[in-house]
Structure formats: structure tokens, C-alpha cells
């Protein structure tokens, strides 16, 4: 499936992202014993605190959308990391920084790690 991206300073799921979330939900529902960490990211613009909050809201928005598609809540955890893994500088053009405003979907197989994630 394609990547889920967000518009600058937004947490709303775009129509394109909604289509991708549909695809992800279908994949997740094939094996409900798996666990997924949904990580929200931001670009480098803005304060660290603001970006942490924004990235958490983005991750929460995707988790909520997946739950609405029937994915059990017990399969999902959301974590925001702000701009910790952004690659483009805050002065880069918006078209480049867009690549940092993303969601990372990770299968978690280590249950000790899963239980450690808040």
C-alpha cells in the first residue's frame, strides 16, 4: 500500500489517505492476532512540543479510522514522535517536507516491547 501523508499543520485524514487506510484495514483484518504500532510524524517546522502533540493526534486519527473500518482496538497502539525522524530541514520547500508528515505502520512481534509501549 502507499504511504499516508498529512497536509501541513493538519490532522485530518485526506480522501487519498482514507483510501490507503481502507487497504491497510483489509490487510490487518486477515490476521487479528497481529499487533500494529501506528507512529505519527511531522516535518521540522514548529516547536518540538507542538510537533509531538501534532504527531500524536495524527497517529490517533489513523488508529480511530482503522477502528471505524472494523480493526479491533486491541491490535493497535498510537505513538507520536514529532520531527524526531524528519529528513528535510524546516527551510526546505513544502513539497519536500511533505514526505516527513507521515504515518509509519509497524508490525510488532515482541510482546514485551508491545506491553512497554504506552
Which residue stretches match the model-derived regions?
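Envelope-exposed proteins and targeting segments
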Residues: 2, 9, 32-34, 74, ...
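Short, glycine-rich nucleotide/cofactor-binding loops
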Residues: 12-13
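Periplasmic OmpA-like peptidoglycan-binding domain that tethers envelope proteins to the cell wall
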Residues: 16-18, 39-118
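Short amphipathic alpha-helices and their capping/turn segments at secondary-structure boundaries
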Residues: 22-29
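Short connector loops/turns at beta-strand edges and beta->alpha or beta->beta junctions
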Residues: 30-33, 41-43
